[in-house]
Amino acid sequence: GDTLKGLFGIGDKKIENIVKGITLFKTSQQRISIGMAYPVVKRIIEELKHNPKIQDIQAAGSLRRMKETVGDIDILVSGAEGTEIVKSFVNMRGVTQILAAGDTKGSVRIEEGVQVDLRVVREDEFGAALQYFTGSKEHNVHLREIARKKGLKVSEYGIFRGDKKVGGRL
């Protein structure tokens, strides 16, 4: 910090903002072990599953794929009232920062320092969404290619033949 002081008119406030930015960048680049992430996701799911608006709740992303380390925790929920579900998610205990809160998505940072993302989908989309948000990106691309060759379209909303939905439930 002291090296920057006075250099090109950089003052204390600017230095403080630069340090905050570097800290945030380092935090966002950190990955945590699955051994640390699993108890966290288990605790969050235990807390949220008592919400009567939630029909199903599962971990997704790299945690569900059992990767050795995860960059964030992804949770998928099925329920009809997305806004209310997201509101209960961002207000749960242990949240230190709300990063986003919308009708179908919420993102928070929790006291363990990890980012947790929640996505709410309809019950009839849950299976397709769980597959899609579990990934990996490469797997999803490969799956879409196989589906295309069979005259199907696969997305987070379901499996379609033309405009007709032919799958998506879990």
Predicted regions and their residues:
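Helical scaffold of the NTase/Pol beta-like nucleotidyltransferase catalytic core
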Residues: 1-58
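Acidic, metal-coordinating catalytic segment for phosphate/diphosphate chemistry
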Residues: 83, 87-170
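Short flexible coil/turn linkers enriched for glycine and charged/polar residues
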Residues: 12, 51, 67-70, 112, ...
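Generic alpha-helical secondary structure
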Residues: 33-41, 82-86, 140
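Flexible glycine-/small-residue-rich
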Residues: 20-22, 77-79, 120-122
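Divalent metal-coordination and catalytic microenvironments
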Residues: 11, 61, 147
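Active-site nucleotide-donor binding segment shared across nucleotidyl transfer reactions
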Residues: 42-83
